[in-house]
């Protein structure tokens, strides 16, 4: 009997090992030079030991593009050699590295407009409007201009190749200008259809042509009239209908940064067939609540959890409280799940 119990337990352990590991993802930005990536590389062993197995690195225009050098941001952007060096470190530590390029929105921040729209102002969805970026959150590119996609895909290709990436995060959060009265090309048009068209354009290039997995933020796909998340975590401008017009193998990353009793967006995406990677931020209690709800209510399409680090100083990353406490909770939940599986198959004496 003891031998039987041991054999069954060993079988359970073997099955657990063979299952895909839950994603313990860390989103990082402002590592915009080779030196910054090299410094981050020194933290990778500790992050791996803590349990991080996915890094989503927001690159954007901080890369030494060869196809379009005019679109480099800063005087010392990440080089292909620097990217390759960092990717090699990640691979050695079994960390999946996923680069990100903010698409459609986030083409400016405060008074600074980023290289695409400064070099090609005709790509702006609201050309000539909002001087000094006053009166808007961020500038957006025109998804109906085919020249935009031709150039952007060249940038994405360079980043994918440099980081040897098998997945790519395209951003696409906080979009507010589609269908704007100030937008000659999209004025009066259905923002949900426009948004879906943009998502599908990128999907065709990344997934169908480059054969990489595609991730995107989920806020513009959540109906803010149905789910009470407000106009930032959800959409009140019509883009949410795009959720039924895009491929279901896109990985959706809904971000929720406040404590709630439930997070129905996660279940909504899963019920529609998407895989989901929820993201939290700086509030420890909110992080615990999001992880707890996700792990309790979601099934196999829940990939894990993403920790975002907006505003976190680089020298404080390893001790970032939501990261430390969130990983601790995830370990506790995973341990309980393994124990529960063993109890279900272990014969009683």
Go through the PLM ranges and name each one.
Residues 24-28, 55-57, 97-99, 168-170, ...:
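Hydrophobic faces of well-ordered beta-strands that scaffold small-molecule active sites
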Residues 277-349:
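Substrate-binding cleft of secreted/luminal carbohydrate-active enzymes
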Residues 21-24, 46-60, 87-129:
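Glycine-rich, aromatic-flanked loop segments that form ligand/cofactor-binding clefts
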Residues 33-48, 153-155, 260-266, 287-293:
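Short, acidic/polar
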Residues 104-158, 278:
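Active-site-adjacent "subsite" loops/lids of carbohydrate-active enzymes
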Residues 146-273, 285:
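Active-site neighborhood of glycoside hydrolase catalytic domains
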Residues 48-82:
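Aromatic-lined carbohydrate-binding/catalytic grooves of carbohydrate-active enzymes
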């Amino acid at each position: 009997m003891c031998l039987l119990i041991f054999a069954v337990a060993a079988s359970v352990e073997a099955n657990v090992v063979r299952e895909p590991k839950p994603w313990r993802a860390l989103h990082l930005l402002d590592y915009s030079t080779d030196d910054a990536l090299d410094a981050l590389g020194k933290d990778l062993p500790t992050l791996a030991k803590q349990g991080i197995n996915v890094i989503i690195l927001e690159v954007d225009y901080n890369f030494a593009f060869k196809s379009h050098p005019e679109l480099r941001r800063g005087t010392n952007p990440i080089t292909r050699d620097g990217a390759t060096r960092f990717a090699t470190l990640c691979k050695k530590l079994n960390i999946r590295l996923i680069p990100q390029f903010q698409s459609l929105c986030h083409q400016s921040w405060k008074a600074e407009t980023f290289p695409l729209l400064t070099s090609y102002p005709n790509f702006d969805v609201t050309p000539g409007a909002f001087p000094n970026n006053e009166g808007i959150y961020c500038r957006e590119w025109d998804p109906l201009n085919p020249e935009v996609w031709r150039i952007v895909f060249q940038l994405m290709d360079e980043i994918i190749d440099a980081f040897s990436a098998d997945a790519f995060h395209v951003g696409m959060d906080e979009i507010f200008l589609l269908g704007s009265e100030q937008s000659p090309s999209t004025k009066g048009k259905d923002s949900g259809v426009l948004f879906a068209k943009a998502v599908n354009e990128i999907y065709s290039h990344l997934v169908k042509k480059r054969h990489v997995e595609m991730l995107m933020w989920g806020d513009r796909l959540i109906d803010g009239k149905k789910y009470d998340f407000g106009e930032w975590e959800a959409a009140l401008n019509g883009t949410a209908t795009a959720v039924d017009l895009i491929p279901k193998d896109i990985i959706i990353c809904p971000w929720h940064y406040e404590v709630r009793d439930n997070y129905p967006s996660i279940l909504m995406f899963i019920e529609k067939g998407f895989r989901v990677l929820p993201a939290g931020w700086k509030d420890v209690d909110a992080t615990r609540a999001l992880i707890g709800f996700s792990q309790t209510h979601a099934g196999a399409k829940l990939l894990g959890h993403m920790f975002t680090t907006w505003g976190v100083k680089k020298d404080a990353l390893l001790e970032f409280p939501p990261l430390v406490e969130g990983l601790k909770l995830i370990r506790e939940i995973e341990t309980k799940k393994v124990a529960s599986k063993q109890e279900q198959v272990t014969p009683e004496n």
